[in-house]
Amino acid sequence: MPEITSYTYAHRARLVKPFLSYDLSAFALSFLPAAGEEVVSPAPVRPGPDDRASRDDGYTYHHLRRDVFDMARAGGVDIESRYVVPSAHITLGRYLSHEDHGTPEARRAWVDKINQINAWLENEVWNNHGCGFIGEWIVGQERGLDARCGPLWYGMGRTICVGEGF
């Protein structure tokens, strides 16, 4: 298990351009795989492996997902994903009822606010290194992957092992 949870220590994938996304059940902070954007995260603590992956983005989030999936399956783990399309996101909240978005006007106001925040992220955070926010996420920075068992969505399941961060 530690081989999988600490995999990001030597296989670093960068995610950039944070934006709010939503569907019928929740909203999240989502990211895109890096494709040559300037690295703005602080350097990892040494000693560490050659950090080529997070410098040239040759190893992407999609590679990481594939590799971890393959290792888990090779170990006999049956994986049931909630989403068919790969997604890099942090769920911020779930809708518990339809009260707050019960009218077309309320839904429009919600979407307008999300669009306003996304415009701010794009204009003020994505390429503005002096704004006080870091608009990227190097997977494994600070802590490794979190291996969990049981249904993982909606905060369920439990942690079995957390990998080494950098």
What are the language-model segments listed below?
Residues 1-166:
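Histidine-dependent nucleotide/RNA phosphoesterase domain, centered on the 2H-phosphoesterase fold
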